[in-house]
């Protein structure tokens, strides 16, 4: 079943990347569909993917400056309200929130 799904995904990507399908070559790919498409496009090269896992933060605590519980680092930042203006440029932003094509996917291969 998984092999059939992979073959079908590859076929869809090939059809969408053909010269006659330029208007339909971009599509939204999210979640497992995005991962499957990356597996198909990148093949043996692979791609950068790390599933979310819980990390131990204890080793990182040594990098933090000791502050009292009442102090808040965000209060010291004069432009804290403009923090929402950050531009996200990851594969989810590029291929899930906006349509992407096979060439966009190739940019994420190793």
From Swiss-Prot:
Propeptide part(s) removed at maturation, as residue ranges: 56-87
Signal peptide residues on this chain, from the entry's feature table: 1-23
GO biological-process terms attached to the record: glucose metabolic process
Matches recorded under PROSITE patterns: INSULIN
GO CC field: extracellular space
InterPro entries: Insulin, Insulin-like, Insulin-like_sf, Insulin_CS, Insulin_family
Disulfide-bond pairs as recorded: 30-96, 42-109, 95-100
GO MF, one annotated term: hormone activity
Keyword Secreted: yes
SMART domains found in the cross-reference section: IlGF (SM00078)
Primary localisation category: secreted
Protein's name according to its UniProt entry: Insulin
Species: Pantodon buchholzi (Freshwater butterflyfish)
């Amino acid at each position: 079943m998984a092999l059939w799904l992979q073959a079908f995904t590859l076929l869809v990507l090939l059809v969408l990347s053909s010269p006659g399908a330029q208007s339909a070559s971009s599509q939204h790919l999210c979640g497992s569909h995005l991962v499957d498409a990356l597996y198909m496009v990148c093949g043996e090269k692979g791609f950068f993917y790390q599933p979310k896992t819980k990390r131990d933060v204890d080793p990182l605590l040594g990098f933090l400056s000791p502050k009292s519980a009442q102090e808040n680092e965000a209060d010291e930042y004069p432009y804290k309200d403009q923090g929402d203006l950050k531009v996200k440029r990851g594969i989810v932003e590029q291929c899930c929130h906006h349509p992407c094509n096979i060439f966009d996917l190739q940019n994420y291969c190793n």
